[in-house]
Amino acid sequence: MLSPKRTRFRKQHRGRMKGISYRGNRISFGKYALQALEPAWITSRQIEAGRRAMTRNARRGGKIWVRIFPDKPVTLRPAETRMGSGKGSPEYWVAVVKPGRILYEMGGVTENIARRAISLAASKMPIRTQFIIS
């Protein structure tokens, strides 16, 4: 699973997802890509599941680029804990994704193979996505 090696602070505010993605919204490595259409937090497990689905489907052909990285810690409190006594401990990492953001890219394969592999990755995502060609 992806996570930062080290961060400046252990815990972060939740923040809010406004507007569209102005960065990371163009295809820059491969020829085909999966683009987010909704805002969401995508966990490192979901990113990994999508990547695995793509690599298994494409077999040895082509190359895959993961364009998002989970750099935001999500804290959870233990079950049946009373309110107060501080913020919970970091449990997992998420990537903050806004509409327009490229999630995965693929190159070196035919369009129908890429379409099939990317649709498998899209089914692992918690949001609506679209397949785009550069």
Swiss-Prot record:
Signal peptide: none annotated. One of its GO terms (cellular component) is mitochondrial large ribosomal subunit. GO terms for molecular function: rRNA binding; structural constituent of ribosome. GO terms for biological process: mitochondrial translation. Belongs to the universal ribosomal protein uL16 family. Part of the 50S ribosomal subunit. This is Large ribosomal subunit protein uL16c. It comes from Solanum lycopersicum.
